[in-house]
Amino acid sequence: METLREKINKQRKYFSTGETKDINFRIEKLKKLRDVLKSEEEKIFEALKKDLMKSSFESYVTEVAMVYDEINMHIKNIKKWSKKRRVKTPLVQFPAKSFIKLEPYGVVLIIGPFNYPFMLTMDPLIGSIAAGNTAVIKPSESAPETSKILKEILEKVFDEKYVLHVNPERGKEVVEELLKEKFDYIFFTGSATVGKIVMKAASQYLTPVTLELGGKSPCIIDKDCKLELAARRIVWGKLLNSGQTCVAPDYLYVHKDIEEEFIKKLEEEIKNQFGNNPLESEDYSKMVNEREFNRVLSYIDKEKLVFGGNYNRKTFQIEPTILKNVTWNDPVMEREIFGPIFPILSFENLDEVIRLVNSKDKPLALYYFSEDKNKIEKVINSTSSGGVTINDTLVHVSSSYLPFGGVGNSGMGEYHGKYSFDLFSNKKGVMNRKTFLDLKIRYAPFLNKLTIVKKIMK
């Protein structure tokens, strides 16, 4: 039986043949991947249902459809994106032509998370394959059913010398084993804690990395917003996957003049979307495991509870829960919630909210609800985050035309669409000098040449 190291070495040998660099070959593989995905859709839905209790609708919209978008965009644009990109040549280097040549890195390691185990593993794989790399995939051990169907799909499309699915059952042990190997690029999605471990391991070989992490993404609700619409969109964004979304609105800063009315709208909207008992709704998902269930449950402070708070320990479900009068000293504000809790903080002055947001780690996303164009521009220009959505939640992540990634503690590197293709490509600068002219001023001896050079290069 081959060891992991031997399999990775096989990938390296296969990459050196140059087959993955052929653009038509890449396109055909992506088309085949799309065809297999379509034939296996129901199995994907079943796996996500078992792992996270996601409905087929949620699974399609937030996982499968986004993967199709990425595949289609790459198939359509690979030839254009792969062309050498001509750039200007400085006058002092004439006669010459300059261009940027995009080339694949080689063997890429992709470590996927549990919360969107299909999409957040497949999306980076698509960019990696489109750019001409081989890939080693390590899905999350916390989503075992999705990992199984991923393995089935990948084996129908790729030989393991091209794309290798690593069984995640050994969890931390297999990650440690992988990180001892030398890769040409590492793409990790998960917590900041593990992200630091990945980055430290990558530094041993000076391997470039992309870290898609998370953090506490703020949601600011100003008094001039469309209140009912804001509540509807916030409930949708917060409760997708039971709050286990890296860009979920983590906490809500609500203007004090509308706080009570907003909480009522929030309660109404939870009932509209999931009924009077969300724990019985077929559209309401669960925490991924008992550990996460207990962690999120510990954040519910009964003294600040105004709505929800019930749970089902057998199914690992926690009701949508609203907490009022929350402060930064409360446990729920110590780290990313990653669960269906709405902590409400009130504010009077937008500048103060911006100051408080900026005093924390830079978030993966920021949301602002307002109809005031000047205040919208102020929030965008005065804060730093991986991405921003105005008057909605999450939707910026679904666009293949926008870069998605973190900043600071929420991650590094951006992908989706062309940004994925560029991410997994080394940008090689090339200058092709002509031979019919050779100015000797650059060669020694340099006596009496400085004055002339200063006139040219100023």
Regions found by a protein language model. Give the residues of each.
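Structural signal for hydrophobic packing residues in well-ordered secondary-structure cores
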Residues: 15, 19, 34-37, 41, ...
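Residue-level signal for inorganic ion chemistry
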Residues: 26, 71, 132, 164, ...
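Conserved C-terminal structural/oligomerization subdomain of aldehyde/semialdehyde dehydrogenase
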Residues: 318-458
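Rossmann-like NAD(P) dinucleotide-binding subdomain of oxidoreductase/dehydrogenase enzymes
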Residues: 91-229
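ALDH superfamily catalytic-core signature
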Residues: 158, 193-327, 390
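N-terminal Rossmann-like NAD(P)+-binding subdomain of aldehyde/semialdehyde dehydrogenases
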Residues: 1-99
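Residues at or immediately preceding the N-termini of alpha-helices
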Residues: 4, 23, 41, 171, ...
